[in-house]
């Protein structure tokens, strides 16, 4: 019960610090540091300047505060470890030649509250908590806390050195026996990811450190990049929900073309590396991600799918009239093969770093192709139809999944402003051919057949045979009185079905229905817009795929909207 009380109290304090961070005064900064468990004290350097020194196991921060002007004058960060090359500058400002690139100083001078500084302090404390240092009691002479602070710096350092890992940050030293310094790894991770993008993605993306005076690695598209560009995603560390979870040091190797762990002792416990897609969710405009695109253990904070209408929900309805001037009617075909989930954060620990490019490419595909088409379709739906759609979703348990082929579910509602036509079946349904009793033969069954002297067939013979459905009898099948011959021929039929069992086939019956439907309507020939999670096609414009060049995506959407306008 006490643990639950402390946990809830910690959450409340976190909310207060986030939503009511307080004004920037030396007293509030001191209280903020103390609330996080950092040792802090204030020294009076002269009549005007007070120096707040705060420290934990590794970090030592000096903040010089001008009491007369009520402003922060300088902030310095040093690390009590052998690695003291941690970058706390705004890379974009540094590249632009701005001398004020110190993000700790900027977060205390460029804002009205402590919110930005609180974020940066939490990030540093997180790295401090889960980092291992080779020597806690070594601070190089270059790591002095500045002029006029030699005595104070050494006393604070001595206090920090006496703190054990368990007492300093709540992490059991027996659990974290790894040798990973997260400060060093975070500094080098930018270089590794940029090399990965250069060699695996044709330099399509680039990583910039510490944007908008916040710690983190921000990922941009290389083409058209500028300081005003909006990042696609950001990479940062976060406490793991499973305290015993290990985080290993994975680096990108140009020799192998993959992410590798060179030393199994370089790990930390209780921390995750997060990739967060930069997307401003609203009630009707959210970021959707295909559920089966990456392993589900990467998903963090998956939201309720039914809170908003999905892309595939809208596309399930057959016909819409788009464009008030031309009254263009098109047929929409839903060919989605997976559910879309509302999620923006992914756990890219360890070898999952290899999936960064796939997630980013999907993000661009969604923003460039699926999202504009989705918003265009939503804008064409009247309020009455919107209520019908939401009612259909609410009354159906397994709506719009690959397995659901209920014709009633796929029917579109009546629209007084748009042309709707009901479909008898879902267009281009993907299904698997059934094997005998929906059961695949095992290896042991093949051995039994051989022992009993039953006829066997090679893979080549099976592939060469004409495919037949289980419920159809081929015309050329001669059933003789010879049971062995009959069994062998029957095996040939079943074997052929087994081989084709994994093939994703187009339902020919559904296609025939679609062809007949497409010829109906006022004009007698209604163009078809087919959309799934990685492919879009439209009659007369061709198609574009997730695997095509990005320029083709934009050109296809532009041409498609010209048809709608």
UniProtKB/Swiss-Prot annotation:
UniProt-listed Pfam families: Med1 (PF10744)
Lineage: superkingdom: Eukaryota
Keywords per UniProt: Activator, Nucleus, Transcription, Transcription regulation
BP GO terms, sorted: negative regulation of transcription by RNA polymerase II; positive regulation of transcription elongation by RNA polymerase II; positive regulation of transcription initiation by RNA polymerase II; RNA polymerase II preinitiation complex assembly
GO molecular function: transcription coregulator activity
UniProt key word Nucleus: yes
Cellular localisation: Nucleus
Positions of region (Disordered): 141-170
Chief location bin: nucleus
Family assignment from sequence similarity: Belongs to the Mediator complex subunit 1 family.
Function: Component of the Mediator complex, a coactivator involved in the regulated transcription of nearly all RNA polymerase II-dependent genes. Mediator functions as a bridge to convey information from gene-specific regulatory proteins to the basal RNA polymerase II transcription machinery. Mediator is recruited to promoters by direct interactions with regulatory proteins and serves as a scaffold for the assembly of a functional preinitiation complex with RNA polymerase II and the general transcription factors.
Name under which the protein is recorded: Mediator of RNA polymerase II transcription subunit 1
Gene from which this protein is expressed: MED1
């Amino acid at each position: 019960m006490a643990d639950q009380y402390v946990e809830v109290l910690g959450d409340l304090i976190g909310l207060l610090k986030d939503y009511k961070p307080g004004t920037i005064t030396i007293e509030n900064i001191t209280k903020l540091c103390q609330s996080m468990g950092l040792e802090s004290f204030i020294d009076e350097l002269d009549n005007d300047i007070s120096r707040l020194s705060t420290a934990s196991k590794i970090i030592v921060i000096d903040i010089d505060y001008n009491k007369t002007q009520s402003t922060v004058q300088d902030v310095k960060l040093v690390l009590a470890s052998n690695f003291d090359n941690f970058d706390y500058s705004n890379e974009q400002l540094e590249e632009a030649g701005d001398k004020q690139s110190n993000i700790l100083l900027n977060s205390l001078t460029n804002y009205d509250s402590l919110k930005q500084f609180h974020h940066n302090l939490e990030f540093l404390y997180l790295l401090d908590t889960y980092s291992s240092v080779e020597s806690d009691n070594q601070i190089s002479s270059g790591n002095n806390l500045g002029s006029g602070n030699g005595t104070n710096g050494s006393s604070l350092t001595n206090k920090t050195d006496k703190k054990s890992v368990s007492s300093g940050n709540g992490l059991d030293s027996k659990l974290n026996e790894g040798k990973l310094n997260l400060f060093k790894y975070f500094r080098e991770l930018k270089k590794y990811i940029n090399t990965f993008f250069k060699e695996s993605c044709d330099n399509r993306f680039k990583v910039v450190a510490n944007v908008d005076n916040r710690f983190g690695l921000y990922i941009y598209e290389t083409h058209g990049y500028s300081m005003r560009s909006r990042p696609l995603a950001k990479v940062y560390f976060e406490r793991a929900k499973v305290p015993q979870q290990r985080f290993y040091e994975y680096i990108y190797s140009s020799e192998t073309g993959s992410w590798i762990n060179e030393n199994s002792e370089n790990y930390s416990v209780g921390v995750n590396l997060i990739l967060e897609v930069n997307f401003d969710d609203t009630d009707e405009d959210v970021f959707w991600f295909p559920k089966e695109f990456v392993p589900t253990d990467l998903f963090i904070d998956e939201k309720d799918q039914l809170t908003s209408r999905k892309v595939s929900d809208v596309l399930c309805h057959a016909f819409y009239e788009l464009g008030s001037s031309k009254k263009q009617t098109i047929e929409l075909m839903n060919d989605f093969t997976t559910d879309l989930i509302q999620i923006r954060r992914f756990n890219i620990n360890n070898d999952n770093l290899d999936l960064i490019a796939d997630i980013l490419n999907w993000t661009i595909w969604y923003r460039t192709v699926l999202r504009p088409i989705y918003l265009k379709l939503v804008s064409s739906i009247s309020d009455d139809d919107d209520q019908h759609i939401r009612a259909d979703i609410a009354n159906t348990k397994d709506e719009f999944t690959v397995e659901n082929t209920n014709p009633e579910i796929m029917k579109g509602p009546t629209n007084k402003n748009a042309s709707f036509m009901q479909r008898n079946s879902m267009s281009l349904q993907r299904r698997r051919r059934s094997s005998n009793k929906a059961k695949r033969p095992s290896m042991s069954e093949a051995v039994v057949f051989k022992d009993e002297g039953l006829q066997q067939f090679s893979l080549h013979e099976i592939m060469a045979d004409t495919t037949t459905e289980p419920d159809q009898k081929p015309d050329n099948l001669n059933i003789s009185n010879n049971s062995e011959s009959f069994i062998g021929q029957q095996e040939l039929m079943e074997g052929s079905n087994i081989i084709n069992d994994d093939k994703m086939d187009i339902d020919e019956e559904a296609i025939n229905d679609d062809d007949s439907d497409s010829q109906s309507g006022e004009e007698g020939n209604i163009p078809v817009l087919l959309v799934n999670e990685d492919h879009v096609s439209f009659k007369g414009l061709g198609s574009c795929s997730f695997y095509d060049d990005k320029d083709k995506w934009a050109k296809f959407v532009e041409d498609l909207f010209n048809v709608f306008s």
